[in-house]
């Protein structure tokens, strides 16, 4: 783990809890309520990558509903978990099931020295690259989240395949 990254970010930014972060990405009322199927409401999907074992399932999907309650349980896991800023119909994270994109995420791995972060933030502050809405420490690098003003619909009738 690259300890200098959260230390560096902590000097310049306030930290959000996972619940605060995902509530900002998926505002209250955007996701389906737990136990209800609502027309026009969809869910986020968390994919938990499980330890590799022969002849076993290597991933588990979790449905994230509007109460975000499942986040607390997922945070207890030592497994790698992915939650994209996209809502889906159903349990599968495939393009055909994508319904709305709430943010664009850029994954920057390979940040091995603090001067890489310093250079990145210099470029942001001086307008060479856009400043993200959120910066997330991933454990091996950072994710830059650019939250959209309005979610982009992904329905088949309006998305060019």
Could you tell me what each predicted segment is?
Residues 101-108, 144:
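Active-site-flanking beta-strand signature of metal-NTP-handling nucleotidyl enzymes
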Residues 114-126, 148-161:
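Helical (often loop-to-helix) elements that flank the catalytic cores of nucleotide-handling enzymes
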Residues 1-103:
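DNA replication initiation on ssDNA origins
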Residues 89-96, 121-139:
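Catalytic micro-motifs at enzyme active sites that drive phosphoryl/nucleotidyl and oxygen chemistry
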Residues 94-98, 136, 154-160:
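Conserved aromatic-histidine-acidic binding/catalytic patches
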Residues 85, 108, 137:
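Pocket-edge structural micro-motifs
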Residues 135-150:
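Short, conserved phosphate-binding/catalytic loop or strand-edge motifs used
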